[in-house]
């Protein structure tokens, strides 16, 4: 999303505190992470398919160049602030065109795209979730999806969609041989400044440990000054606290001590491609 997020991703990937990340192609700082990823085979980077520009003053437009008639943009020509507005206005064909433009841009920049996931969960909207999966199939890249929408952490923008509504998309992903996650955990952006983090408790909860495949959608960001602190004046500390925690040897020791097997999206992509190649 920004320089601090790019810096944190590269630093923590090399430290071992995280195993994968995803880039927001429409954002102004995308060229930086594209350049870094193209020159660093260690970095496991997907595309964070983006249909919204939710910040007050740090905003972005469609990569495809589509305008008002597409329903993708607000009156100022930016992607909508709210997922609800995107769902109410965007034409599914335009959404797919924009996704493909973002993926094509990432590939052309030299990124070895390991997976596709959804900024603010918007790609999982029932208006176009089938297209989300089909785009992944077309590019031979797995998409992030859970067995139940209620187990997808960033689902607050899809509150009207039930698990029953979502079943057909899960079936579609499974039929395509996609890895389907049991749960997606997300950063707690409501944590007040000064309160201790709870990541250790989150990752060792009994229901989490009982799952086979869990995705952690965290948002570490290196401190500015004057970047993330201005972009997110109310929640910047959550991101910088993640950066500080995940960069410690204590965090690595904690992960090593748990009954967890860390994997990468590149490994899951390889398994997916091997399985689909056998079916051809």
Spans of model-derived segments:
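Active-site beta-loop-alpha junctions enriched in small/polar residues
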Residues: 24-26, 48-54, 119-121, 148-151, ...
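A short, acidic, amphipathic alpha-helical segment used as a generic capping/interface helix at domain edges
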Residues: 195-211
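Active-site gating loops and adjacent loop-to-helix segments of metal-dependent hydrolytic enzymes
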Residues: 58-88, 229-234
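C-terminal domain-boundary segment and adjacent tail
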Residues: 143, 231-280
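Structural preference for beta-strand elements that scaffold enzyme active sites
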Residues: 18-20, 42-48, 113-117, 142-144, ...
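Catalytic domains of cell-wall/extracellular-matrix polysaccharide-remodeling enzymes
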Residues: 92-93, 97-174, 179, 192-197
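A short alpha/beta connector and helix-capping loop motif
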Residues: 3-27
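Acidic (Asp/Glu)-rich catalytic clusters
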Residues: 9-15, 30-44, 61-74, 107-108, ...
């Amino acid at each position: 999303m920004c320089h601090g997020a790019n810096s944190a991703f590269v630093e923590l990937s090399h430290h071992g505190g995280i195993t994968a990340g995803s880039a927001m192609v429409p954002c102004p700082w995308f060229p930086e992470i594209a350049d870094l990823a193209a020159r660093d085979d260690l970095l496991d980077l997907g595309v964070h398919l983006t249909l919204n520009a939710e910040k007050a003053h740090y905003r972005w437009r469609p990569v495809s160049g589509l305008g008002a008639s597409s329903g993708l943009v607000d009156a100022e020509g930016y992607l909508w602030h709210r997922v609800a507005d995107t769902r109410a206005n965007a034409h599914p064909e335009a959404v797919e065109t924009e996704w493909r433009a973002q993926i094509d841009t990432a590939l052309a920049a030299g990124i070895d795209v390991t997976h596709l996931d959804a900024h603010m969960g918007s790609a999982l909207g029932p208006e176009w979730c089938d297209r989300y999966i089909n785009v992944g199939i077309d590019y031979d890249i797995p998409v992030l999806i859970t067995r139940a929408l209620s187990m997808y952490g960033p689902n607050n923008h899809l509150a009207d969609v039930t698990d029953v509504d979502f079943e057909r998309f899960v079936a579609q992903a499974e039929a395509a041989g996609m890895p389907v996650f049991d749960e997606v955990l997300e950063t707690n952006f409501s944590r007040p400044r000064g309160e201790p983090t709870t990541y250790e408790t989150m990752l060792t909860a009994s229901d989490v440990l009982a799952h086979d495949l869990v995705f952690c959608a965290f948002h570490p960001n290196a401190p500015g000054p004057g970047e993330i602190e201005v972009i997110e004046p109310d929640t910047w500390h959550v991101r910088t606290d993640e950066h500080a925690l995940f960069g410690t040897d204590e965090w690595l020791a904690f992960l090593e001590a748990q009954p967890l097997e860390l994997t990468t999206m590149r490994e899951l992509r390889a398994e997916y491609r091997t399985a689909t190649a056998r079916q051809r």
